[in-house]
Design a protein with these regions (language model features):
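Charged, amphipathic alpha-helical segments
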Residues: 26, 63-71, 168-175
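N-terminal, post-signal-peptide region of Sec/Tat-exported proteins
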Residues: 46-79
């Protein structure tokens, strides 16, 4: 979540569950999706363009995304998708760097789409330890649960990549995640509206570009 934004809560905490496991076909688009979303990305080009225009609008933002299956114990085999550990870093010119780790599960749907689940992070693991380069980091699949405050959402493949728009209502407002995951480029807009007022301090998505190859 960006600076000045507030993490929303849904009216009711619905219990979402991960899907039954199945073998993924070799030609399923999730394999292309995985290659697009895995790696290191930042919006340094976007920031440079904004500064050249006279005003920085977006925070500097960086994602460090890695497939996290090998960090999860008791993982089913076959697995109908993959886990991704995302390290998110955000910094406005006048503020400190905000660090946010996320664990996602992406499910291969039969019709060729990809379903996103945002997972709850175990409370016993300190956020500072949830890093891709932490060799001691372990999750237990048997205790992992999808977040009750983010409704699972579906990416549809388009000419530009994989597109998702996911509104989540909460008391007094709505949080909408809109993304396009493309080759070497991620477009991410997180729009928070509360009591009819826009909290997100910008109207256009953060444009991430790949800055190095996947490890």
């Amino acid at each position: 979540m960006k600076k000045n934004a507030v993490v929303p809560f849904l009216v009711a905490c619905v219990c979402y569950v991960l899907p039954l496991q199945a073998q993924i076909p070799d030609n399923h688009p999730i394999h292309l999706f995985q290659s697009y979303i895995t790696g290191d990305f930042d919006n340094s080009r976007q920031i440079a363009q904004e500064l050249q225009a006279g005003k920085q609008v977006h925070p500097y933002a960086k994602h460090v995304n890695r497939v996290a299956n090998e960090k999860i114990d008791h993982l089913p085999n076959p697995l109908n998708g993959f886990f991704l550990l995302e390290e998110s870093y955000y910094k406005y010119a006048e503020g400190d760097t905000i660090v946010k780790p996320y664990l996602f599960f992406f499910e291969a749907l039969p019709e060729g789409k990809v379903k996103l689940y945002s997972m709850q992070l175990p409370k016993e693991i300190a956020p500072k330890d949830i890093r891709n380069d932490n060799p001691l980091l372990r999750f237990d699949y048997r205790t992992l649960q999808p977040s009750p405050t983010f409704r699972p959402a579906v990416y549809t493949q388009t000419e530009r990549g994989f597109y998702l728009k996911a509104p989540n209502e909460f008391p007094g407002g709505v949080f909408t995640l809109e993304e396009t995951i493309g080759k070497d480029r991620l477009e991410v807009m997180e729009l928070l509206i509360r009591e009819g007022r826009q909290i997100t301090p910008y109207n256009m998505p953060i444009i991430y570009e790949r800055i190095n190859m996947t490890k």
